[in-house]
Amino acid sequence: MAKGHRSQIKRERNANKDTRPSAKLSYARVSVQKACFVLDAIRGKDVTTALGILTYNPRYASSIIKQLLESAIANAENNNGMSVENLYIEECYANKGPTMKRIRPRAQGRAYRIEKRMSHITLVLNER
């Protein structure tokens, strides 16, 4: 058990918090594999370059990730006071979420299972 006064423990915990601007989308209706195709294309890029890539990328996941990136940019400006010109994508990853199970009727009374996969997508920005 931790020793010390409760307020001191809180202060220490808040001092160790990550202050980089970020945005997280939970339960996105796109599989991790499909989201990672788009995330690999923008990892390490400047924010303006990444927005251009996401705008003209034909994949469905790119529209979701573009909204998430715009949210992370707004967080950086409003919460951290950073300028957009210096921002770049430091981390971006997709973790596996729950799977919705659905049934597809087939011939002669059979049924095939369809798995609609979800993911949790996280973007972390930083200044150069």
Residues covered by each model-derived region:
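Ribosome large-subunit tunnel/peptidyl-transferase-proximal elements
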Residues: 2-94, 118-128
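Strongly charged
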Residues: 97-128
